Every structure is written in C-alpha cells, then in structure tokens.
C-alpha cells in the first residue's frame, strides 16, 4: 500500500496561488500508486500580513514542521517594505528548519531560447549554503538617519555549517559529471574564503574521483555568460549562491523554468520546494503565469522523498512539453493540463 | 605652455608589463600640446614580492602619493596565496588613497561580438563604492583548522562614505542619460541596504531631472543578460560592484575592452587607472595581450585631469580600430601602433 505523506502548502501571494495547485496535481499524478499526499494549507505571505499583521505565528510554524515536506509558491508584495516577509517568513523557515542545502538546478531545455548566442549544453546544479553567511541577520546600525550613521552586516560562517554542505555537493557530484567548482571571493574575504577552501580540499580527498576547482565570484559571473556548459556542480555560500542562480536562471531562458529546494539533508525538519520566480504582482490573477517551475519543484520534492521514478515522469513530461510547445503562448491552466496529459 | 603631470606607473605582473607602455604612449600622443607627463616607475607586484618579500613599502607608497595620478597594469601570480597582493597592494592603495569611486564603464563597441544573441545598445557606467563594505578587512576567525572554526567577514558602511559616492553617481548621470539604478540586497542586508536607499532618496531630491530606481543584486545579474541596454548609471557597493562589472565585461565581449578608474574625487590623493583584466600569466611575454583596455584607462586618466578633448581622441581612435580590425588577430604592439596611428 502506498504510504501517505503530509505536505505543508504555502501558496503565498500573486501567481504563487495560481501555480501551486499545478505542482500539487503533478505530484499526485507522478506518484500514483507509490505515494499519497495529504495537504495542510497555510495562509502566509503578504496578503495575510496586510490583513492581520501575522508573518509566521509560532503555532503555525510548529504545524509546518510536523509535515514531511513543504511546497511554497511565491511570497511578496510591493506594498510591503523590503525585508519584512523575506526575513520574517522565507528566511525564517530556511533557518529554523535548518535547510542548509539550497539546491538549484539550471538546465537549458530544448525549445527554450537562451539570451546567449551560443549557449552550448547547459546543465549544472548550484549547491548554495542556506543557513549562514550574510543571511544570518547579524549586523546593525548606529546613529541611524544622521550623517554619522554606520551600518554593518556580518557574515558568519562555521566549519560545521560549511562542511555539511560541502559533503552534500561532493556526494551529488558523484551522481553527475564528478566535478565541483567552489565559488567564493577568497582573495578579499580571506577568513571565510580560506575556511571554505580548506574544507573543500579536505572533503575532496575523500572523493578522489571528483575533481574540484575554484573561481572567484566575479570570474564565475563571466563564465556563466561566456561558457556556462563548463559547470557541473557549483558550490558556494548563501549570498553568492543567490546571485549566481538568478544569473543562471537568466542564461537558461528565464527563471520561469527554474525550481529550487531548501533542503534539510539530515531530515530533522521538512525540506521546502519552490519555483525560483517571485509573486509577479503585474501578471497575477490573469491565468498567465507559467506553472512549469512550480511543477519542477514538485519533482524535486519527489526526489527528496526518494521517488526518483516518479520525479523522472515529471521531468520527461516537462521536457517534452517545452520542446514541443515552449514557444507558444498558453494560459497557466493550459500549460498545467498539457504537462499532466503527458505524464 | 603645457603643464607637466607626474604619473606613478605600476606595470605590475605578466601582461601588465606589456600593455602599460601603450597606455603611456597613448597618453602622450593624446595630450600633445596640452599636457606633458613625467613618469615614476614602481616595481611592485608578484615578481617583486617573490624576489624580496616587499608588497608596498611605506616610502614607496609615500612617493606614489606625491604623483598626480597612477597608471596600473595588472597584479597577480598563481604562485602567491590569494589575498596577499590583493589586500596588501591593490586594495591598500584604494583604501589609503581614499579612492572612493570605482568607475567602470561598459560599452559594446561596434565590431565586438557580444556573447548575447540580442545585446542591444549597451553603454552604461558602474559607480562602485571603493573604500567600504566587505572590502575593509574587518572579520576574523576563531578555532581555525578545527571542526569548531567560526569565520566572519564584516561589511562596514558609513553615511559619510555612501553619500559621497551617491553624489558622484547623480552628478555623472546629469552628463549622461539621467538615470541611476541603485543595486543592493536590501531585503536581506537590511541595515546597509536601508541606509543606501535613504541616502539615494535624499540626494535624488537635489537632482529632480535624474530618475532613479532600485534593483536587488540578484535581479540586476538577470537584467545584465536579458536587457543590458536599460542601464545608464549603476550605483552599488564594493562587493556588488565587483561582481556586476565582471559580468558586464563579459556581456560587452570580454574584459579586454574594459578600463576602470579608482578615483579620489576630492583630489586629496592621486587617482588610479587600470584595465579590468588581470595579469594573465598564461599568455604573458608572448606579445599577445590586447592593450586596448590599458589604452582606455589612459583616456579615463585624461578625463580625470580635465582633458576631455584629449580623452576623446583616444576613444575615437579605439572605436575606429575595433570597428575595423577588432576581429583580426594582432600582436600587442600591432594593436598599440594601429590605435596610435589613428590619433
Ligand atoms: C527573497 C530573497 C530573500 C531570496 C534570497 O535572497 O535568498 C530570493 O532571492 C531567493 O533566491 O530565494
Ligand atoms: C583583485 C581584486 C581584489 C579586485 C576586487 O575585488 O576589487 C578585482 O576583482 C577588481 O575588480 O578590481
């Protein structure tokens, strides 16, 4: 008998609400016969915040934690000051649920036009650290609003936090083309950069089949444009990973095809899967948003739960859909139906 | 009678030594009749360090300071641990000489092939803060080399430091298309980001003709690929500026055409002009390196000293050279001669 998994669903705002149902449908269809899903919906995001001021109430966070995984749509609204929802909801979940691997595949699908003239065969994964670095909210300001104001941001990096994500990257490389590229800025951020490099060298010795090299973040942004097919697994910190994955999304034809997983690889807390795109208030409510990235995030969820064959069904359907119909204008529902029909 | 300017020349390492003489020749030719130059050469960089361990001796730094401007080639050698020369020489000069504006124009020249399929008309300038942020070397580590290691990097940002570079950007925008885009990550780096935004808003009020908007660094890396012609003046901090200008260099066909100025806009200390590319040990000594970026850095030096017409001569010659011969393989000396012949 198929086991039932409990999934917390946070559709969020804008197009998040429109694409998430398609992620759920794809999940069910792909796992038919091998897994069942029971959903718990959470009304979190900008609309909730504007309505009653709540961002992530403690009891709701506890209930989220009791699930096997989380599906998130998108969160955000231009009416809310930058940082409030990001730090109070999205990053809070990543940190509290210790989702230390932020996994972001970039693939140029056949049928998608890259902005690059000669993109080559792009298929790499960014393994972004998710719980440290400049994202930990350390920092402050004195004499705010005066000419003497000083504002700081502190990047905190621990050997504990770095080593576990480095191990994840090498393990992942073993299943791929066996190459890891560490990206940092160790010629300037010498403390953190040196520690990352030492840990990569050490863990690398345990994986003699995996080659690894190093690039400064500035050089990496060049190669993502000039030679993106050189990459297999890119391993980097929280901020550099944020930057590189958006650039990568652009290079593979837009973040509309990019999903991501915020993974607690020790399974202590549920992992979270989301499209990389935002809530896109400009096209919200018009049945226009492309649900492909959300559907791909369902595939990542399935892989995380161990259902590789089910995930493969989604990938195959998405690839065929994009190749055949990627350039036609379709509604959210039409794309969702087309992909499901192929599964 | 033409005034004589004293120029400190730091050819540095690798191809730095090959391209810098062409920057000097272009400088002289362009300023013929309006300015003369007297050079003081400094033997600094990797080769000097490997020879006698000196990076930037105090007396040499004092002599550098006594010049009107600095021409730098490139510094670096793979035999030296990352950070030593960067922090001991390049960044030390930027900081000690208070070069708070790191000015980096990006232009797609006619005759250069961009890696983008539809690059459009790319012509923007990045105004990167040069003396603060994550570059100040604040940070450290405890329990180094143990599983309990913690490494920090601290970004220090002051209203004083931010306001002066913001003013520079708005003034520059008045001479261009009157648009400033602030790039930061204010939804995560809330202390520094909020201060940058407030200061931009405040200074912006003094320039009612200049419009300004904001982009997160991750979004900016997308637009540099998907729609780079939208930018006019990009204003950003030290680290984000480092990243964006390399990506921009790639988008305009390679850092070989990109020059930069580290500018002390209060003229208290000399400003420094350099090509964006590195010392390229792989092609050093082969008369292969393209001197165009170095020659363009001479044009920036001339503009800084107020010789706009002379600078224009260089720009016109470089543009014509690239349009006609940009795709032919030429030696360093041939490119140098060709450009000079047009001036
Ligand atoms: C919304 C923001 C906090 C977030 C981040 O910076 O991580 C986003 O850009 C992302 O990449 O998921
Ligand atoms: C060499 C390095 C310290 C430097 C920087 O990060 O500023 C370089 O990348 C640059 O952009 O000039």
UniProtKB/Swiss-Prot annotation, chains A, B:
Supply the alphabetized keyword list: Amino-acid biosynthesis, Branched-chain amino acid biosynthesis, Cytoplasm, Leucine biosynthesis, Magnesium, Manganese, Metal-binding, NAD, Oxidoreductase
Provide the top EC class.
oxidoreductase
Question: Per the UniProt entry, what is one GO biological process?
Answer: L-leucine biosynthetic process
What is a single molecular function from GO for this protein?
3-isopropylmalate dehydrogenase activity
EC number(s) on file: 1.1.1.85
Name its pathway: Amino-acid biosynthesis; L-leucine biosynthesis; L-leucine from 3-methyl-2-oxobutanoate: step 3/4
Localisation: Cytoplasm
Q: Which Pfam families match?
A: Iso_dh
What InterPro entries does the database record attribute to this sequence?
Answer: ICDH/IPMDH, IsoPropMal-DH-like_dom, LeuB_actb
> Mind naming one GO cellular-component term on file for this protein?
cytoplasm
| Note describing how the cofactor binds | Binds 1 Mg(2+) or Mn(2+) ion per subunit.
Binding site residues for NAD(+): 278-290
Q: Where is this site: Important for catalysis?
A: 135, 185
Positions annotated to bind Mg(2+) = 218, 242, 246
Q: Which cofactor does it need?
A: Mg(2+); Mn(2+)
Which residues of this UniProt protein bind substrate? 94, 104, 128, 218
Reaction catalysed by this enzyme: (2R,3S)-3-isopropylmalate + NAD(+) = 4-methyl-2-oxopentanoate + CO2 + NADH
Where it mainly occurs, coarsely classed, is cytoplasm
The annotated subunit structure for this chain is:
Homodimer.
Q: Which HAMAP family match?
A: LeuB_type2 (MF_01035)
Task: Say what the protein does.
Answer: Catalyzes the oxidation of 3-carboxy-2-hydroxy-4-methylpentanoate (3-isopropylmalate) to 3-carboxy-4-methyl-2-oxopentanoate. The product decarboxylates to 4-methyl-2 oxopentanoate.
Q: Which family does it belong to?
A: Belongs to the isocitrate and isopropylmalate dehydrogenases family. LeuB type 2 subfamily.
Name of protein: 3-isopropylmalate dehydrogenase
Natural source organism? Bifidobacterium longum (strain NCC 2705)
């Amino acid at each position: 008998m198929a086991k039932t998994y409990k999934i917390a669903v946070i559709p969020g705002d804008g197009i998040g609400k429109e694409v998430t149902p398609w992620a759920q449908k794809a999940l069910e269809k792909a796992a038919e016969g091998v897994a069942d899903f029971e959903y718990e919906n959470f009304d979190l995001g900008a609309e909730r915040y504007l309505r009653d001021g709540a961002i992530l109430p403690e009891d709701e966070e506890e209930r989220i934690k009791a699930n096997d995984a989380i599906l998130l749509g998108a969160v955000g609204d231009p009416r809310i000051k930058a940082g409030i929802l990001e730090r109070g909801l999205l990053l809070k979940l990543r940190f509290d649920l210790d989702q230390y691997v932020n996994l972001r595949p970039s693939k140029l699908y056949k049928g998608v036009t890259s902005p690059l003239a000669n993109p080559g065969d792009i298929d790499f994964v960014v393994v972004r650290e998710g719980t440290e670095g400049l994202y930990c909210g350390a920092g402050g300001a004195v004499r705010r609003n005066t000419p003497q104001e000083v504002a700081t941001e502190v990047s905190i990096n621990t050997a504990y936090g770095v080593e576990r994500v480095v191990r994840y990257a090498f393990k992942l490389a073993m299943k791929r083309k066996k190459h890891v590229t560490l990206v940092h800025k160790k010629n300037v951020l010498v403390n953190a950069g040196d520690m990352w490099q030492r840990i990569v060298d050490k863990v690398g010795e345990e994986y003699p089949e995996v080659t690894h090299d190093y690039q400064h973040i500035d050089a990496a942004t060049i190669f993502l444009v000039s030679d993106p097919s050189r990459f297999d697994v890119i391993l980097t910190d929280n901020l550099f990973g944020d930057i590189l994955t958006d650039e990568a999304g652009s290079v593979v034809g837009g973040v509309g095809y990019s999903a991501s997983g915020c993974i607690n690889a020790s399974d202590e807390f549920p992992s979270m899967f989301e499209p990389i795109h935002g809530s896109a208030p400009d096209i919200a409510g018009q049945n226009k948003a492309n649900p492909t990235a959300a559907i791909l995030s369902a595939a990542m969820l399935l892989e995380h739960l161990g259902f590789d064959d089910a995930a493969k069904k989604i990938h195959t359907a998405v690839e065929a859909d994009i190749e055949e119909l990627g350039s036609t204008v379709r509604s959210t529902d039409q794309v969702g139906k087309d992909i499901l029909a192929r599964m």
